[in-house]
Amino acid sequence: MTPATREPQQAANEETAPSIRAAAAMTRRGRSFTKDNVVKAMFIVPAAIYIILFFGYPVVKNLLMSVQEYTTKTFFTGEAPFVGIENYLTVVNSNLFWPSIVNTALFTIGSIAGQFVIGLALAVFFKRRFPLSGFLRAMLLLPWLLPLIVASATWRSILDKDSGILNQFLTGIGLDAVPWLTSPSVALTAVIIVNIWIGIPFNVTILYGGLQDIPDELYEAGSLDGATGWKAFWHITVPNLRPVVSVVLVLGVVYTLKVLDIILGLTNGGPANATQTLAIRSYQESFVNFEFGVGAAFSNILIVISLVFAVIYLRANRRAVDE
Amino acid sequence: MRHRRYLTVLAAAAVVPIALSGCSGGSSGSSGDPDTLTILDYYNNEPDKTLVQEALDTCAADLGVTIDRESVPGKDLIQKVLQRSSSKTLPDVLMLDNPDVQEIAATGGLSPLSNYDVDTEGFADGIIEAATYEGELFGLAPAVNTLGLFYNVDLLEEAGIDPPETWAELKDAAAALTDGDQYGIAFSAIATYEGAWQFLPFMWTNGGDETDLDTPEVQEALQLWVDLVDDGSASNSVLNWSQADVKDQFAAGKAAMMVNGPWQIPALNETDISWDSVQVPVNEAAQTPVAPLGGEVWTVPETGDKDKQAKAAEFVECISSDDNQLALSESRYLVPTRTALAEEFVEKMPEMASFTEQVANARSRTGQLGEDWPEAATVIYNAIQLAITGKAPVDEAFSQASEG
């Protein structure tokens, strides 16, 4: 669940606490607390409506679509015959299913590893104050501010084999030109590189915030005991940053699993299906082939995978609270 | 207190979308005014937007109706049409890309033109085929496009090469014209329907057919593309080039020839490249070049309002009238669909001669397979990608691609 939906519930809980006390006070005087119950319910209603409308309905609809033969005809006639698990069988038996699972895994692991390592390095770097550090840190947010479609179009021209600036640079320093987006063996790497670039601001921002929360006294005390440099990083920074790290990683995984626009903009799943992921398969089945049922089946598989990570996140969080 | 205000805002925010969705239904779709026709198309870029508007205004004045036009980006049109058909708010007049007509007609969302008194005589066979589903004609196109071979006149003259007419000549010319960072030829082999569309002239001209892709004729066409890339006469970036990218390469002087359509002519005329075009080369001298037909068809959706549908049918007929065909073809570099207009048109627009000839023999993509065409197109572009990347040999590419 995203932070945006958790907040209202928390707010509602905090809000009801005083009214429970008021209710208890009223019970002593008489049994007229129905109005109070209504008030309590009213606090939940907005959040409930929001969740049912914008989370519940799409999820249920998607589950339904995945067991129906849902095609272009359905939109006009409203008829979508029930086909059971046939769509799921189509998905699992398609030649692209396992390659797209592998690609999704490689894409996610590669992106997260790159984003996190570079993000953490930059966050630690910017913890020191130096001239222009504030300005440079703001500039780091730039990839986040660009519309993804613009970013992918720009990267597409940068990575172009013949006239792309990256290959011009590589041949300039005496290396061979790399067919970034046209060779099945490097295209996935190229797409991961671009996604790392896009994900760095998110990682830097959250990790930088986490670093700010580590009290300076710890480092001062550590340095008296001889913990400086790498030692300070391993024994003070890393343990204190752990809760933030788990947030960054889990959210990162969930965001990366569903990446669509960057891949569509860069390679459209090609060359020779080398960059097909579950998200791309789902999009192409639904909006290119108009097999909405099969597309829904693909996206449900994706949702289940995301859900696993969401559960890991929630459990890790609960453990942190218990501790 | 702070929390309470926050919640009030949240409650209000939760109600807003519900309120909004409540009133959005009435504003679009067939409007209540009997003399207003709603129109949906995908000409959302200039100059096409204005040029088409002129044609629509002419017809609106002729029929004494007012029009309420909406233009959406091309890739969003089908989604928009599907949304509107489920909410029963289809427009009175709907433009569709010709390979989509049968798919939409199959949903039952379009009204056959035989219900109305519409003159459908004299149109090129290909475009009638594209707009026909189960024996009924569902729309008319005023003007169409196709593919041809553009060449850079200066570069060919310098090298002393005549525009190629056969595949062998094409390969030789492309090899001879490749020099440094200039490639002999550019085409689009991208993993979308665009890649399949660009392959069709070679496949069809050689006698290949989309009903059976595992034939020597189709494989020979694929071999030609693979050879062009393997020889280095075409960049392997063709795998990721859209037709617009191909035009950019040609316009930048990085490709001496390109496979492309006449809709690129306005952009080419803005560059200082001197270009000309010929029909797509054939494998053997006796063959006739057969290219795919592109362009948009105007249809009458089933809106439930019989009087308006009749008016919309008149409107569709008017868009495809002789005068409109010529006007649109001239301004947008298309080819009129009434074959009788060809001669007059080429006289006025000599640069469109090869495309006009190409259109006369052109085929529609959905002529044979109808609503199953997208599936075949997917197999075609996947096979092209497999073969050019070397992931599969040419003779196995199609069977491998068809396995999904």
PLM region spans:
Chain B
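Conserved N-terminal structural module of periplasmic/extracytoplasmic solute-binding proteins
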Residues: 2-16, 20-103, 284-286, 307, ...
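Extracytoplasmic "Venus flytrap"/periplasmic binding protein-like
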Residues: 55-125, 132, 157-165, 256-257, ...
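Extracytoplasmic/periplasmic substrate-recognition and gating elements
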Residues: 57-58, 159, 230-234, 269-331, ...
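A structural signal for short loop-to-beta-strand junctions that line the ligand-binding cleft
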Residues: 83-84, 91-92, 120-154, 287-290, ...
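Hinge/lid segment of periplasmic solute-binding proteins
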Residues: 98-146, 171, 179-181, 195-198, ...
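Periplasmic solute-binding protein
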Residues: 104-109, 127-163, 188-210, 293-301, ...
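C-terminal capping/gating helix-and-loop segments adjacent to ligand/active sites or protein-protein/ligand interfaces
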Residues: 132, 334-335, 354-403
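Glycine-centered hinge/linker elements that transmit conformational signals in sensory
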Residues: 174-178, 211-239
